């Protein structure tokens, strides 16, 4: 694909903070799309409640141990610096949610607003997302690949001023509210996917071969020079629309081997495999579950979900999850669907664990084979 064409990405604007950043690039967006819903979101996303949210009791301030409190304080200060949250005053019909921290891959903490209760007042529409199957259908022998990872993706979308009161939390006697889209909002994946559609349409109209999953882009082409040119154009286009590229997580220099959506694709061998860290994580979990006399049904269900997610890269992996699924089903039946009840692993499942313990290190798969399963 040539990066020349009638539509050239406009120049990037200088904007200091990431929160709600896309709103300052409205003019550039209006060049590539006339979708009024998308353009309205850029002015401020209005949460599409099916009924007006209410709380019988507000979420109380959570008490943390000193170490947790320090970590929470650091995370909230980072949100303030990014402009993602602001201190606010109480108002009628506000909605307060609890929150917690999760550790990111780099060891830093990410603040998560627990919007489980608020999400009951929202109903995200059904929509399709591109995934590993999309990649497997497009990829060809000896093609070169590059990836682009977007930084602070959800935070770039502004929330309309009339709806920030539903995204509030308390910490150390202060009241805060998100002014941009937080993690945990059930409609966020739909909004972000629809927001990216005009970009994909433009790229594909110019002949680019690309796949997108939320904040991750994969670009594919036949030659190194073509992919280098296409990648440069795509990066410039994304910058011009207000997106921030995460250089550390992106692979901007095209290669025949790259990681995308938690898998490693190799176009020379046309194989798909797992990164070392994911293999290691599964192996450790296998050993822990194997050595435990009993475990919660929930723990097995989570582990099963992880095993199923990696099966595209482990040949015959699906076959060695069936007995575990049966163990889970029988345990839930016995304990009246109580996922917190304890269970033991059957001898047949322990045999499957032995298979996984070996194949998690040696296994890979033909890129197209899993499409037939």
Residue ranges of predicted features:
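C-terminal reverse transcriptase regions that engage the nucleic-acid substrate
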Residues: 123, 177, 252-371
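Active-site palm subdomain of RNA-directed nucleic acid polymerases
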Residues: 37, 189-238
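Catalytic palm active-site di-aspartate
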Residues: 114, 149-151, 184, 205-224, ...
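Conserved pre-motif C helix in the palm subdomain of viral-like polymerases
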Residues: 79, 143, 154, 174-208, ...
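Conserved catalytic palm subdomain of right-hand nucleotidyl-transferase polymerases, strongest
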Residues: 106-119, 135-159, 299-302, 373
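A short acidic-Thr-Gly-centered motif at the start of a beta-strand
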Residues: 91-93, 98-108, 130-144, 365-373
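Reverse-transcribing Pol proteins
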Residues: 1-127, 174, 211-216, 314-345
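Conserved, non-catalytic sequence blocks in retroelement Pol enzymes and Pol-derived host proteins
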Residues: 61-71, 85-93, 105, 121-127, ...
């Amino acid at each position: 694909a040539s990066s020349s064409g009638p539509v050239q990405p406009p120049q990037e604007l200088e904007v200091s903070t990431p929160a709600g950043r896309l709103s300052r690039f409205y003019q550039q967006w209006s060049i590539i799309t006339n979708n009024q819903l998308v353009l309205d979101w850029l002015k401020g996303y209005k949460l599409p409640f099916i009924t007006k949210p209410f709380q019988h009791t507000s979420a109380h301030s959570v008490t943390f141990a000193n170490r947790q409190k320090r970590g929470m304080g650091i995370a909230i200060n980072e949100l303030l610096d990014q402009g993602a949250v602001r201190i606010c005053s109480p108002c009628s019909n506000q909605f307060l949610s609890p929150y917690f921290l999760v550790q990111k891959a780099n060891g830093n903490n990410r603040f998560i607003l627990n919007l489980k209760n608020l999400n009951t007042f929202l109903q995200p529409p059904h929509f399709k997302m591109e995934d590993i199957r999309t990649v497997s259908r497009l990829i060809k022998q000896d093609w070169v690949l590059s990836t682009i990872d977007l930084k602070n993706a959800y935070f770039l979308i502004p929330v309309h001023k009339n709806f920030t009161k539903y995204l509030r939390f308390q910490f150390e006697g202060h009241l805060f509210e998100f002014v941009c889209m937080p993690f945990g909002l059930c409609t966020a994946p739909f909004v972000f996917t629809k927001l990216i559609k005009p970009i994909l349409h433009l790229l594909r109209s110019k002949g680019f071969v690309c796949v997108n999953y939320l904040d991750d882009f994969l670009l594919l082409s036949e030659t190194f020079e073509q992919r280098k040119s296409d990648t440069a154009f795509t990066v410039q286009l994304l910058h011009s629309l207000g997106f921030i590229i995460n250089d550390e997580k992106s692979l901007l220099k095209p290669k025949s081997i790259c990681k995308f959506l938690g898998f490693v694709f190799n176009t020379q061998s046309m194989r798909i495999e797992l990164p070392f860290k994911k293999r290691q994580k599964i192996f450790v979990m296998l050993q822990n579950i194997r050595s435990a006399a009993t475990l919660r049904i929930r723990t097995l269900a989570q582990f099963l979900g992880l095993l199923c997610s990696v099966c595209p890269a482990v040949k015959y992996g699906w076959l060695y999850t069936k007995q575990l699924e049966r163990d889970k089903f029988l345990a839930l039946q016995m304990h009246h669907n109580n996922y917190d009840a304890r269970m033991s692993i059957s001898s047949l499942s322990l045999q499957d664990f032995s298979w996984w313990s070996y194949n998690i290190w040696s296994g890979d798969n033909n890129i197209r084979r899993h499409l037939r399963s």
